[in-house]
Amino acid sequence: GVDDPKQRPLVRFRLGDLWGDAYIRDKGEHKGQAAASLKARLLKAEPLDRAELASIKLHELITRGIGYLSRPKDVSPKDGDPFLSCCVAALAGPVGEPEYRYFDTIVATPEAEHLVRRCVQAIEGDRKVLIAFR
């Protein structure tokens, strides 16, 4: 990437101290409306060698936010233990013009399973169930 202009450089970023930055839009269709962005302090940026990329065995995505809960489903695989799954439509982007990022999830803890099961009737009744997740 750095020496070959035809390849994109690979860069590893380490972020810390996340915070929300609220502001009022000063132009565009939503001028005068409140909005916010998520910012972070850049702790480190370093080139990532392609050989190191090939040695990565586990990709880790750590995220938190709010979103709508949908499609709760009990799954009983033939060769494994049954589990509860659901979809989270995570909100992303400006508050006035949100976009959605969809995550199909396995509900991992008994506490979370209890909470999701409490919402099943509302979801089946076409009510929106907004959740916070991390």
Briefly describe each language-model feature range.
Residues 1-134:
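Single-stranded nucleic acid-binding surfaces, predominantly the OB-fold ssDNA-binding core
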